[in-house]
Regions:
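Membrane-interfacial amphipathic/re-entrant helices at transmembrane-helix boundaries
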Residues: 1-32, 61, 72-75, 101-106, ...
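Cytosolic-side transmembrane-helix boundaries in multi-pass membrane proteins
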Residues: 2-5, 15, 124, 184-198, ...
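Inter-helical junctions in multi-pass inner-membrane proteins, predominant
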Residues: 14-29, 169-174, 200-243, 262, ...
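Membrane-embedded helix boundary and interhelical linker motif in transport proteins
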Residues: 21, 43-89, 93
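Helix-loop-helix "hairpin" substructures at the membrane interface of multi-pass membrane proteins
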Residues: 26, 143, 147-225, 248-253
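Alpha-helical transmembrane segments within multi-pass membrane transporters and channels
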Residues: 37, 70-113, 120, 253-258
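Pore- or pathway-lining transmembrane helices of multi-pass membrane proteins that form conduits
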Residues: 53-57, 98-122, 229-241, 269-289
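Extracellular/periplasmic helix-loop junction at the C-terminal end of a transmembrane helix
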Residues: 115-144, 267-274, 294-299
Length: 301
């Protein structure tokens, strides 16, 4: 660990540029999946433990399309549409039945959904790690110390464009306004004539489509495997818990922070500590909020 610290900050400080860039590229993808989770959590009060599995499904959708000769970027709209329909089906079969129940019911339901999706993907694609070749070149800087795969740059642009489109949709469209109204007060939304069931169905389907986009980007940048979903679920929960519901700038900022934390944890302590870093961030945020809550209670008393 000390040798890695010395390498990072003394012998080759230019490697920090690599860490910062990778954190940005990773954070952009995390932000998409995390925003989808924040949307479902904030509007429907459903903690979707299958969030990461939706991401992996999107990745396997791109992988399947490449097998028939379609470039993964051109597979994006197809994967979005398929995942949107899939989200509607899951809502009708599973989520609709647990919305008004206790929080633990939704946790158990989505946990069961996660296990089911993992096994289905395992049966179809096998347990092997898969990747999608995007055929983009890799740029180098600082005499090769910093590498910038162009697919990561393109993924950053696509993630930013998609996030911008979602924000515009939520602010300008009638459905977006209905979603925001339902998130604030479902009963008042019903009084105003908003079909909250339709809003819930659309919200969950939109979340699935967002995860599908994130999954395509993940497949092009890293690797996918049927049981990797839990990794992305942990990350999205850490981001949303830290940023708060309905806070898109906070989700984006926390996604970048988590991306940087993972990169530095990996280079300093080893790759096996990257996911552990996300878990420690989650534990730290929960502990800090518990301390703040206790202080507020003491002030009230």
């Amino acid at each position: 660990m000390l040798d890695n610290l010395q390498l990072l900050f003394v012998l080759a400080p230019v490697m920090n540029v690599q860490m910062i860039l990778d954190g940005i590229f990773i954070g952009a993808v995390f932000a998409l999946a995390a925003y989808g989770l924040a949307l479902v959590w904030g509007v429907m009060n459903v903690k979707n433990l299958a969030q990461g599995d939706f991401v992996i499904m999107g990745g396997f959708g791109a992988y399947t399309m490449t097998k028939v000769g379609v470039h993964p970027i051109f597979a994006l709209p197809v994967v979005m549409a398929v995942m949107f329909v899939f989200g509607l089906i899951v809502y009708r079969l599973v989520i609709k039945r647990v919305i008004d129940n206790d929080m633990f019911v939704s946790l158990l339901a989505t946990f069961g959904l996660s296990l089911f999706l993992q096994q289905v993907m395992n049966l179809i694609y096998g347990p092997e790690v898969q990747t999608v070749d995007s055929h983009f070149h890799i740029a180098t800087m600082f005499d090769g110390f910093v590498t910038v795969p162009m697919i990561k740059v393109i993924s950053l642009i696509l993630a930013g464009a998609f996030a911008t489109a979602i924000v515009i949709f939520m602010k300008k469209s009638r459905m977006g306004q209905a979603i925001r109204a339902t998130a604030q007060d479902p009963r008042a939304a019903r009084v105003l004539g908003i079909d909250t069931d339709k809003v819930y169905a659309f919200t969950y389907a939109l979340n699935a489509a967002i995860c599908g986009v994130a999954g395509v980007l993940v497949a092009m940048i890293w690797v996918i495997q049927p049981f990797y979903g839990i990794v992305y679920s942990l990350r999205t929960f850490a981001i949303v818990t830290a940023a708060g519901l309905g806070n898109l700038p906070g989700v984006i900022g926390m996604s970048f922070i988590l991306g940087w934390v993972e990169q530095y944890a990996g280079i300093i302590a080893g790759a096996e500590w990257q996911i552990a870093a996300a878990v420690m961030v989650l534990i730290g945020v929960l502990s800090w909020r518990q301390i703040q809550l206790r202080r507020q209670r003491q002030v009230v008393r």
